[in-house]
Amino acid sequence: MIQIKNLKKEYRTNNTSNLVLDNINLEIKQGEIFGIIGHSGAGKSSLLRCLNLLEQPTDGSIFIADENITKKNSKQLREFRKKVAMIFQHFNLLSSRNVFENIALPLEIQGIPKSEIKKRVFELLDLVELPNKANAYPQELSGGQKQKVAIARALALNPLVLLSDEATSALDPTSTKQILALLKILNKELGLTIVLITHEIDVVRKICDRVAIIDKGRIAEMGKTLDVFLNPQAPVTRSFVETSIHTKVPDFIAKKLQDNPYSYDNTYPVVQLTFYGDKGKMPIIAEISRQFNATASIIQANIETIQDQIVGIAICHITGERQGWENALRFLSNQDVNLKVLGYATADNI
């Protein structure tokens, strides 16, 4: 659906230049919700605005639905932009127009007959669950309702792609939840491809199929959302993930860990076990005690939800005879769970 090849964006002022996007390559599949996350100034907004050429790339190419949009002239681009809609953090509704008129605006610009406009607007109001707000003005709406109107307006011309520029950043938690639920419905019911940029990792966690992490104008990491959350590779990714799910080892444990299990007598492994899906039903900790004459003491455990997938994360201290805990580690490494040895500690030090 969307291919970005060797994309660069540089801002030049007088004798200075600022490279905000450096050799970006990624592919977004049709019908997926793709998240782009990064800290302020990472380049994510510039990347999104390049996707509809609100920002002209300095170099590289962008293909949407097999069309190279970077090669289009102004007239061709105006026509193509009907296929790529956009919503914004601050809604951008016209205060002088009511809800009906705001949604109708792109249809009016296209010269659609009034009877068709009326039908389409009320279809969209039903779709975004605001059937009784046609005559209300933006100042009479909550933030979540304003964003729903903005979404309805964006969908007026039946786009292939919806670009979301920090669309939940100005909303309260309840409204954020409602907007994310609506985007998931639109994605499934309309087959709408959604490209979502945000600095909120929980937004990615809840609805994105895949995610790219941008840092200093480059893609630091990219993959399926569940994979990225459970096994983050780049430091910037780990910093985001640790604010969303409890994967970080508590400081009071970390400072007691040794790298070498044989540095001291009676030193045993501290491990992190991650279960998800049907894997959580396996009695692995009980099996350790039963098979290997070892004890797995749970230090910390929590349940998370990533993209409607239940994920369990447990930090355990495995104690017992050396052969027993070594066999237990081998057993765990062969099971269908994620195993990470965090370090080693004595039984009375955790």
From Swiss-Prot:
Record EC number: 7.4.2.11
Class in the EC hierarchy, top level: translocase
Coiled-coil segments: none
Domain ABC transporter: 2-241
Superkingdom, natural source: Bacteria
Record's keyword terms, sorted: Amino-acid transport, ATP-binding, Cell inner membrane, Cell membrane, Membrane, Nucleotide-binding, Translocase, Transport
Protein name, entry field: Methionine import ATP-binding protein MetN
Organism: Francisella tularensis subsp. tularensis (strain FSC 198)
